[in-house]
Amino acid sequence: MKSIVTTFFGLIFSISLMAQVNPGDPWFGESCTSIMAGKAATVDGSVITAHTCDGNYRTWLRMEKAAEHADTAVYKVYKGTLHTETPWDMRKVELAGEIPQVAKTFAYLNTAYPSMNEKQLAMGETTFVGPDTLVNKNGMFLIEELQRIALQRCDNARDAITLIGGLIEEYGYGDHGECITIADKYEVWQMEILGA
């Protein structure tokens, strides 16, 4: 009897899981998988975040160096960087705007969705979409640029969340719903962004 009940619930679980996967959905393959584990959830007290990039995005990566910048320097914000073929490919990239640059930026791993900096601040990303009516077409930022700027400027998760929120409030967010996981050496957070 126990094996019949286990099989029944396993079958129900499998059917309900498959019902959520619809290859005909235009957003199928756009929702990455993110993983988070805080200190209390790991054997050695580590903090972990990871994500799979399940979309059709660039595969190259590059370690960007730490840098110092002049007081008058600006940071150029781009749209379209997810689909570049090399670090210098600007064919489908457009300038969205500029923001003031900070005096010093950290080294970070530049991937389709920038993922970690020299201070062990790490990020993962998952698209969860949402209705088109919630997309701010005039918003300057896409999620990958917000991640890039936070990794350049922040050494902990809370500061990254504050910075990203402030940039969205000031310049706008111009994409569908996103969930980013943000981890440092001590804690991990999940931040959801939609329609700003």
Predicted regions: what they are:
Residues V21-L142, L163-A196:
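A contiguous strand-loop segment
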Residues A160:
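Aromatic- and Gly/Pro-rich donor/ligand-binding loops
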Residues T133-K137, E145-C154:
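Second-shell loop/turn segments in exported
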Residues M1-V21:
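Bacterial Sec-dependent N-terminal signal peptides
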